[in-house]
From Swiss-Prot:
Bilayer topology term: Multi-pass membrane protein
Name of the featured protein: UPF0756 membrane protein Moth_1009
Pfam families: DUF441
Organism lineage: Bacteria, Bacillati, Bacillota, Clostridia, Moorellales
UniProtKB keywords: Cell membrane, Membrane, Transmembrane, Transmembrane helix
Annotated source species: Moorella thermoacetica (strain ATCC 39073 / JCM 9320)
Secreted as UniProt keyword: no
InterPro entries, per database record: UPF0756_TM
Length: 152
């Protein structure tokens, strides 16, 4: 019952803040709970959801390359402007940090920070116009911060 109330609260915050992706995800989980199929489907989502979500996200990002709307010439021009070069460098950094964050949460087993990451992502998506992909980057920054402080 408590978990249903928490997901319902997330749904309300998401709807109020117009965070459609969070609202849709919370709605899906609520429907699965109400249909009492959560014990069968939640383990699959929990185990493979991140992987399949990333596959779909990356596929969506790669569609312009697959369609041919982004050419080799376009890719070459990326390195000719400071904005393109900055985007490339920042992409390297944030992708690396996301990987560190995923490892921090899963391999290293620091799941105790997950509630704070979820709450921050939901609030940022609902009220700051953010997109809730931040928990991996956030946990990556956290992993680097923890490593840095451990060396002091």
């Amino acid at each position: 019952m408590e978990s249903t109330l928490i997901i319902l609260a997330v749904l309300v915050v998401a709807v109020l803040g117009r965070a459609n992706t969070v609202a849709l995800a919370a709605s899906l989980l609520l429907v699965l709970k109400l249909l009492q199929v959560d014990q069968y489907i939640f383990p699959f989502i929990e185990k493979g959801g991140t992987f399949w979500g990333l596959v779909l996200l990356i596929a969506a990002i790669l569609v312009p390359l697959a369609r041919g709307t982004v050419t080799l010439r376009d890719l070459g021009h990326v390195f000719l402007s400071w904005v393109g070069l900055s985007a490339f460098i920042l992409s390297l950094i944030t992708t690396y940090m996301s990987g560190q964050g995923l490892q921090y949460l899963t391999v290293q087993g620091h799941s105790e920070v997950m509630p704070a990451l979820i709450l921050g992502a939901v609030i940022a998506a609902a009220f700051l116009g953010g997109v809730p992909v931040g928990p991996f980057i956030t946990s990556g920054v956290l992993a680097l911060l923890v490593k840095l402080i451990a060396k002091l």
